[in-house]
Amino acid sequence: ITFLCWRDICRKSIMNPKNTGIPMIDKALLFINGVPPKNLPETEDYAMIACSDGAFHYLKEKNFPLDKLDFISGDFDSHLGNDEAIYHDRFIFTPDQDKTDFHKSLEIIQERGITAVDVYGGSGGEMDHFLGNLTAAFLFKNHLEITFYDEFSTYFFAPKTLVLENVKGKIISLYPFPLTENITTKGLNWPLNNESLDISKRIGTRNLASEETVVIHYGKGDLVVFVEI
């Protein structure tokens, strides 16, 4: 997926995941402890690569080049065994139990001047973890452009105007967080025209892109968009 983003508008293309529109000098790759990706992404162009202590285990099992990790964060309740001695200089101990490992990793990434993060391992498994990750992303959405990837879709908090390209035939879901008002769409099989979505009444899941380009605009609230990969 390609990202060309500004403060209030974002253009995303499904064709080329490497051409993101954001200088890679400002972009991080983060692995957290959800369901591991079946295929690891290419890493050479990221400014920073990091993982939680739990994700370290599946990266090792998948023969990920661990020397590329800039830091490993967490409370280290997942013991790393002999690897502790090898990679101890990259450990960042974050014992605060009031924050998730994902939240603490985002704090470190933001402190180091990064503006965008691609996240793998954010979904699947225990659903409370997924909801916690989504909430952490919400807290950082004005500071970091966070995009999640899993086996089925990519998802993110959308700006007020979002343009999706090369998406014809793909499932597009609009999820209010928790209320999104004045939504207007173009290029969806079931369009919205200045309508609202409310988590307690109506959500916009499982829509379908009827055109190659889909435009989503909304007024008040926050909106999570899921795009089928």
Locate the predicted segments by residue.
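N-terminal beta-strand-loop-alpha-helix module at the start
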Residues: N16-D83
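Long, charged alpha-helical interface segments
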Residues: A158-I229
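Class I SAM-dependent methyltransferase SAM-binding "motif I" and its flanking Rossmann-like core
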Residues: A136-V167, I172
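N-terminal glycine-rich phosphate/adenylate-binding segment common to multiple enzyme folds
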Residues: I114-D128
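Short Gly/Thr/Asp-enriched flexible loops that form oxyanion-binding sites at enzyme active sites
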Residues: M127-F138
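Short phosphate-binding loop-to-helix
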Residues: R90-E111
